[in-house]
């Protein structure tokens, strides 16, 4: 909660630098995400690209994501929430709860900041910070989405994946304009665009208003869901 109301520049000014980190954030050459900045310069952990959660002891994954302010003054999420790459080059786990995507999504420390294109990226203000876990109702849909994605991959048809096939958990393209391709583990071993598991933007908009901003009577467009109890 200490982060709420701070700008990224104020985070940098705290002077926290983990041992062995030489990244220079406060310049135009830094192309990384703001989540890495928070992990290293607020929590003091050296960022890594491992499949485990960012804070392994607590099993918590850190994600920083932008918010857009609409004309009516309400917020909407600025983008989907990318979780982890989909491994096309090896077998996909049939059990959702044993998968890397569950390790990355079981507990997420969400840091939402207001995106203002008139301000420098380091002067964006952090609005909300909260740990979220998918509710039991959400997990029913997420697990079914995972099953659909895994079934297509195991059929050797990863090139047919599309975010439109699922409800909450998506398979978004990665790489330069989705052009990077990888050979599939499953026959006929054709190449497919690299993709990552993500929580779709519509689902994250629901999470923002129902779990973080605690608003009521809001639903994901075109989806029928039951409101979950507070967890």
Roles of regions detected by a PLM:
Residues 1-55, 61-231:
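Nucleic-acid endonuclease domains
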